[in-house]
């Protein structure tokens, strides 16, 4: 259809302010904020990592992939000013205190930026484009936080056991379908015994494979220089500690509890990781 303008016809100017407001009003989720006073956990997961890891890394575990995930977890902990970061398999969970107010607790920004940090860090380190998705979990008390991380560690153990059993069967010549069928609905004890029969002691495997890895801030002393007094002095700095020997069960619960009273010591802005 061709529009024809008659002589003398006036084209009314568009009200830019009105249009601006109309468009802003359609950003339905922009005003969403995380509940004030709640503990926050951001969890990022690798998108399509089942196929990605199958074609780029050894199975069931690959040290290079493990290091990439730890590097990504450290970037999230530092960039977003978290308290504790935990990674297992292709996921990372980062804990933030109730006082955390980065991005004014905007849900859209938290989800998009956390996914971006994870994707960019892994991609830059591995030189292959990958994507992470992100979600937000909220807790109202310390017990829920402890339960969350115990839940994720239990998932790490389950996935590690299933992974070792599956790939052992595949190496023995079973098809993907047959290996899955043989393990379906089998008990934890059955799978442990299956590995033992084939020379693999699950409990002797590297701890990070079945308990995950924790990252958190630690203080250390560093020699500095005081120009006013013209002498060297000892100063306290903080850096990220990578813990691949995490405890489990009740000891892990107490380990997590130890981080939950550190809110006042967390950075409000800037980067505190200093090697």
Where are these regions (language model features)?
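Regulatory and interdomain segments flanking nucleotide-handling catalytic cores
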Residues: 3-275
